[in-house]
C-alpha cells in the first residue's frame, strides 16, 4: 500500500512509471488535516477536489486506487489509526509513503512505521530542486542564511539565466530595483482579467457541513483555483502570455481602484497564482521555471510576436521566487525544526485583533488585504509581508497566532513554506535566521506602493493624532500610533535588546526611499 497525501498530487512521480495490480494507492480525507488549524473553506475544497481528481486520473490510467472521503474516515481519530486498520483489512505486506513536507506528519509516519510488523519504506516526493539529503550542504541549524547568496548558488548549479562564461545573464543577479513600481491610473486598464476555473465543489461543501468542519472565509460552490494538471498548465500558459510582461514591474504594487470601478482584478494583478498548484505538487517548480524560460527565449528569438515584449527583469523576478525563495524557506524549515516553531526573538505576546477574521477595520490597507484573503484565500507577497505582516510585527502580535492565521487563511499555505515566511521574514521571530533585518515600514511605504491611503479614514501624514495611521488603541488605551511610531516602540523595547542587540539590526524597509 502506498500513501499519497493531499499535497503529493505529482503525476510525474516514479511510482507511476509502472503498474502493479498488487499495489494499492491510498488517498484519504481526514479530520486530522481539516482540524489542526482553522482553514479557509476554499483551501479545504481545493485540496479535497485535487485529491479526488488525482484519484480519478490514477484509476483511469489503470492503477488500483482507494479514495476515502470524510464519510469513510470519520471513525478514525488520526492517520496512523486509519493506516493500521487498512493494513490489516487489505492484508498489506509492505507500506510505502512519500516523505511529507511537514514535520508533524513526517514524525507521525515515522513513529507508525517503527511499530508496524510489516516492512515499510519512505521515498522522496521528487518535487523540489534540492533533495532532502542535499539540504545540509546549503543550510545549518540555527545559522543565519541569506537568500541572495543561496539563490546565486542555485542559479549556478542549475544553469538558469547564466551566460556561456558562467556569469549572470544581463550582467547582474538581481533586478529587484526595477520592480518597485506603483500602479498609476493609466496602468489600471491594462491589468489582465484573471483566468478563473469553475470546479464544482458543492458535494465537498455538503461534506464539510455534514461533518461540522470549522472553516473561515467565503465559500463558493464553483472553485476558481486549478485542481488538476491540465488546469495548472493552462494557468501557467496564461501567466506567460498575459501577466509575465509586467510581473516584475508591478509585483509589489497594490490597488483598490479596480474593485471600486466594479472590475475585480485588483486581487490578482500580474501574479501567476500558481502557488496552490505548486504546493500541492500538481505541477513542479522545474516545469514552471522551464516554461517561463522557454517563453522568454522564444520571444527573444522573435518566434513569438507578443506585445509588450518581456524583458529580463520580469523573468528574473519570477524565477527568483521559485528557484530562490521557495527552495530557501524549505531548507530553513527542515534544518531548524522543531525548535523553529517556538522561536519568539522579540518576545511578542499580544493577541491578534478579532477583525483579522472579518476585515472590519477602518484601515484601508488592512481592510483590503483581509477582505481579499477572506474572499479568495489569496493575497500576494507584499500584502502578506508589508500590510498584515507589518502590522503584526509593529504591534507585537504573538507569532504563534500570526502563524495560525496565515497557515489557515491562504490556499497555498503549508507549514514548511508558511512558517519561515511568517515567523522569520515577516515577524523576525527567528532573530535573523531568514532575514538580516525586520521588514518594518511606515504608512509612507504603503502610500508609495498603493492607492489605499487616499481613501482611508486615517491620514498617512498624521503622527500621534486621533486620525493617525493606523490607530492601535486596542493595544494601549488612549494612545494612537502610526506605523513609524510603532516601529520606534520596537527600537525602544528593552526585550528586543536581549536578542543579538536587535535594536541595531532592525531597519525600516527602504527607509531612504520613503523618508
What are these regions (language model features)?
Residues 78-225:
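Beta-rich, aromatic/charged-enriched effector core domains that present basic-aromatic interfaces
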Residues 13-16, 36-39, 77-80, 105-110, ...:
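A short acidic (Asp/Glu
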Residues 63-77, 355-358:
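Glycine-rich phosphate-binding "P-loop"
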Residues 5, 10, 253-256, 265, ...:
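C-terminal catalytic domain of photolyase/cryptochrome flavoproteins
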Residues 1-15, 41, 169-299, 309-311, ...:
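Substrate/cofactor-recognition hotspot
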Residues 8-10, 74, 99-107, 393:
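Gly/Ser/Thr-rich loops at beta-strand to alpha-helix junctions
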Residues 1-70:
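N-terminal beta-strand-loop-alpha-helix module at the start
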Residues 67-73, 123-127, 250-252:
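Acidic carboxylate-rich catalytic motifs and surrounding loops in phosphoryl-/glycosyl-chemistry enzymes
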